[in-house]
Amino acid sequence: NMLLTMVSDDSGSEGDKVIEKQYISSMFGNVKSNDLKTLKGYIDKNYDLIKNDVSTIKYSYNVEPLIYTKDVTNKITKINPSEFFSSFGASSMYSFSSVFNQMIDDISSLEKDYNVLAGSWPKNYNEMVIVLSSKNTISDLLVYSLGLRDSSELNNMIKDIMAGKEVNIKNDPMEFTYEDLMNVKLKLVNPSDMYKYNSKFKVYEDLSEDSDYVKKIYDNAEELKIVGVVAPNSSNSSMSLMAGVAYPSSLTKHIIDLASESEIV
């Protein structure tokens, strides 16, 4: 994810402090009115640069975890699959806004390329690690995606861009400890739970826009734990993990198992 990996310098913070780099904000702030073509071209160009640079082959079932969190305003928010940039209508935009990625199973290989800054690598299907592009920096996209900023701010930026308005962002960079990042609460939702059978019409209704229903599902959903924070070491040339949040293949298997038990597949 280029919007996560372009943040690579360690300036401005030391120790276990992680400072937010406002890459998204500055990119949007530099887009002229009605200049969507330039913005989309920029992202498409950079996407092409990195998509061929993935050196680790992994097999995927094309299954994505449905993940919710409560953001800083206490609003229950879907953070994966990401809906940021969906209004642009481009698959490459989605690739750039996607924060959650399945990691390779070979932990010993990852240990050679990454430093564990806090916590540990996942040992169970419901455990994840935050992958920083460098030990003391975090992209504002990841900050928004983890609910550490009000997600409506980013949505409003995107709406302004789409409406041809200039974006004015006046946020000061945030600073976090590794513990702050590991304390983010995530919930795994079974997609079929977002549907409820309507006996009158004999159909399953999608209730994902019903806030009361979503709250009930969220409250009863299983928790995902962020058990570690990692960053590439100086000798890392493989970049086998994308910056963002990495989860084990066992989570994918768990999701498939849940789907197989559901009445709706």
Where do the PLM segments sit?
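Basic-flanked hydrophobic alpha-helices used for secretion and membrane insertion
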Residues: 1-265
